[in-house]
Structures are given as structure tokens and as C-alpha cells.
Amino acid sequence: LIRHLLKKAGSREEKAYLLNHFLESFRGTLFRQTMFAEFEDMAHKKAARGESLTAESLCSIYRQLNADYFGPAMTVDRQIDYEWERIPHFYTPFYVYQYATGFSAAVAISSRIMSGEPGALEGYKKFLSGGCSMKPIDLLKLCGVDMSTTRPVDEALGFFGELIEEFKKCIHTNE
């Protein structure tokens, strides 16, 4: 849908808005949910080692992850330390990674279909009609997406990079 909307955008401003919206979806789903999964994994490993899970130790883990994920260009202030406390995803353990993998799979599927890859659309229809007949990872293989490799995530990150470059051109030129 986003690719269609970008093609139909009537102005540079509209295109910039759409690109920003999609980039934020990418950031929130692929990067942020991966960071949440890493936080959750680190907290559970800490508990498994018999270490106490205090607010202070969890804040420290979360702060460091924010610094690692967002890098030196972003100021990581003290308020972010407590964000983990209000994230309801942590009530149900070990599922947030599915947002990032699902988003990556969707990007891979749509890229194959949009590029006209032979069999991509038919594979997607088989995937959809497969329902719950197979494990999701096997259903995805029907449309050419192998989540047992890094390829879908690598492709999604490559596409993210392309979108950033397109966004930069859009806001810095008079296209």
C-alpha cells in the first residue's frame, strides 16, 4: 500500500509525510521491538543466574540498550530509564520478536510481488490459503521467505536504508 501511495503522492510534502510515516513504522516495529526482546532476554537471563531484578538494575539494562540501539546521535535522558515499566508487552514473555520477524517477512513478500518475481503472487496466495495447516515458518517458505536465515531481515534493513535515502532527497530537494 505504501508503495502505491508514494507513487500517487501529489506533492513533495505528501511524499515526505508518507515516507516519514513508513520509516516510523519500521523503527517502531523492527528496531524497537527487537530492543524490547533483547531487554526481556537480558532480564530473564539475569533472573536465571539468581541475580535480583531490581528497578535499578532493569533501568540500567534498558538505558544501555537505548544507548546501544540509538547511538551517539540521540541523547538518552534519565526519563527513558523507566519506560520499560509501562510496556505491557512484557506481561506475556517472549513474543515481541514476532513483530520484527513478521514485519521483515511482510517486506520480503511485498518486495517479491512488487518486483514481479515469477511465482511470488501465487506463493503468497498459497501462504494465505494455508491457514494453520503448517507451522508459520514453513508457510512463509511457500512464498519464498526463509525466516531460518538472516536474508529477510537483511533485505528489510536494506529497504529501510533505501527509504531513508529517498526521504533525504525528498526533504532536501525540490523534486
Segments (PLM) and residue ranges:
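Hydrophobic transmembrane alpha-helical segments of multi-pass transport and channel proteins
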Residues: 26-31, 93
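Short beta-alpha connecting loops at secondary-structure transitions
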Residues: 18-25
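C-terminal, non-catalytic "cap/extension" segments appended to globular domains
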Residues: 1-13, 37, 43-175
